[in-house]
Amino acid sequence: MTYLLALDQGTSSSRSIVFDRGGRIRAMAQREFRQLYPQPGWVEHDPMEIWETQLATAREALAQAGLTASDIAAIGITNQRETTLLWERASGRPIANAIVWQDRRTEPLCARWREQGLADAVRDVTGLVIDPYFSASKIAWLLDHVPGARTRAERGELAFGTVDSWLLRQLTGGRVHATDTTNASRTMLFDIDRGAWSEPLLAALDIPRALLPAVQQSASHFGDTEPALLGHAVPVCGIAGDQQAALFGQAGFQAGLAKNTYGTGCFLLMHTGAQRQASTHGLITTAAAQVDSTAPRQYALEGSVFIGGAVVQWLRDGLHAIRGSGEVQALAESVPDAGGVVVVPAFTGLGAPYWRPEASGAIVGLTRGSTVAHIARAALESIAFQSAALLDAMSRDAVAAGGQPVSELRVDGGACVNDLLMQFQADLLGIPVVRPQVIETTALGAACLAGLGCGLYAGTDELAAQWQAERRFLPTMPRERAAERMARWERAVRQTVAP
């Protein structure tokens, strides 16, 4: 049994990937599921669709690999974080649809908590800010809007879980109600210093303790699957939220290692080791994957760009500049540079390190000679500019805490295959940008955690030696020129928030 099965449950689809012991992909299956928008600002998923698509892809991936469940050493789970489910403990029946991390319905409740002066306590205990993004307000909303839910929760009849807990419950036939440290750290209820649920916060936010799952380290034995599901019982030995799993899949095991996931948005995480670092630049302190119960707790700094690869979708669907996303690099490369054009894709405001929700998008520097190719190149460059500003903030936080600035950026996600973007990113940062051989790092991270949890791997040193780069993009732009480009970007950003 030298194969690992990663269940990668995302916001729009469920995927399953079979890895061999060397971290190579043997098979992959994927199924999309419905996005539900019952009211403006609301985003929901059907919990049973999440489960059914995930189980179907697991079976498909095994069949595609020509393997049976008895060939699998362990299962690892990685998941969209913060998305919230409540179900009946006895029957496993969900009492409502899952409220997705993107859902903003609980902003009035979060505003009330801020007015009550809870923001400092939440940041001190959890490392987070009070926001509908995280699970706590979603739990409270369900308790107050599903008839009888709060009373049943207080009696211990209901269970809360993020998506990993829900999948674990289904896989084990209801025997296990648990999560890992990384997912717990995204609920706004978890004390990341103590590694336990915060009783004072639970009381302040009026959330019953009886709802919550047990919390285990990310690489550990969570339980065994029901034999009938896959044809043989398989241990579940690894769980991590998607961004922490991606950092782990990038062999980000030590302080100072950083990764950027280029998806619809961009998610930048830097491992800070056993040191919890507070940010003065609008970043979030969160838990990194925990793999050794005898070692100190591990932490990370996290920041996100709202519009990353989505700017390419805008070029396609909004401007009709390209027919498909794969055309953007060729169009951008048809001109030597952006011709002074700067695109600031603040379509939904600006995230870290700016935190300007009122910002709106802008195209700056247009002249009579500007073409759609210049706009396409500027749009692509905007992904790198935003990531560079974020990494600069992260490095400043690291240095302020006595550490070192980031010296290398590991990249993954769909847009990392764009060589033009990756080279420009390296040029702006002045450090190597490294693309791994396996860019499915979220699933790989879950598989690696499962391999550690079941004893297939001896430790993270073995995994670090196994990680391989596909290409290193080295900076070629003079630093003075890079500074000029960043200064022009910052001037354009200021124009998007000008009164």
Curated annotation (Swiss-Prot):
Domain of life where this protein originates: Bacteria
Record-linked InterPro entries: ATPase_NBD (IPR043129), Carb_kinase_FGGY (IPR000577), Carb_kinase_FGGY_CS (IPR018483), FGGY_C (IPR018485), FGGY_N (IPR018484), Glycerol_kin (IPR005999)
Molecular function GO labels: ATP binding; glycerol kinase activity
Positions annotated to bind glycerol: 81-82, 133, 242-243
Residues that coordinate or bind ADP: 11, 15, 264, 309, 414, 418
Swiss-Prot/TrEMBL GO biological process terms: glycerol catabolic process; glycerol metabolic process; glycerol-3-phosphate metabolic process
Annotated metabolic or biological route of this protein: Polyol metabolism; glycerol degradation via glycerol kinase pathway; sn-glycerol 3-phosphate from glycerol: step 1/1
The enzyme's E.C. designation: 2.7.1.30
Entry keyword set: ATP-binding, Glycerol metabolism, Kinase, Nucleotide-binding, Transferase
GO cellular component, one term: cytosol
Annotated Pfam families: FGGY_C, FGGY_N
Catalysed reactions, as listed in the record: glycerol + ATP = sn-glycerol 3-phosphate + ADP + H(+)
Gene3D superfamilies: 3.30.420.40
Binding site for sn-glycerol 3-phosphate: 11, 81-82, 133, 242
Enzyme class, broadest EC rank: transferase
Keyword rRNA-binding recorded: no
UniProt keyword Hydrolase, yes or no: no
Biological role stated in the UniProt entry: Key enzyme in the regulation of glycerol uptake and metabolism. Catalyzes the phosphorylation of glycerol to yield sn-glycerol 3-phosphate.
PANTHER family reported in the protein's UniProt record: GLYCEROL KINASE, SUGAR KINASE
Protein name listed in UniProt: Glycerol kinase
High-level lineage: Bacteria, Pseudomonadati, Pseudomonadota, Betaproteobacteria, Burkholderiales
GN (gene name): glpK
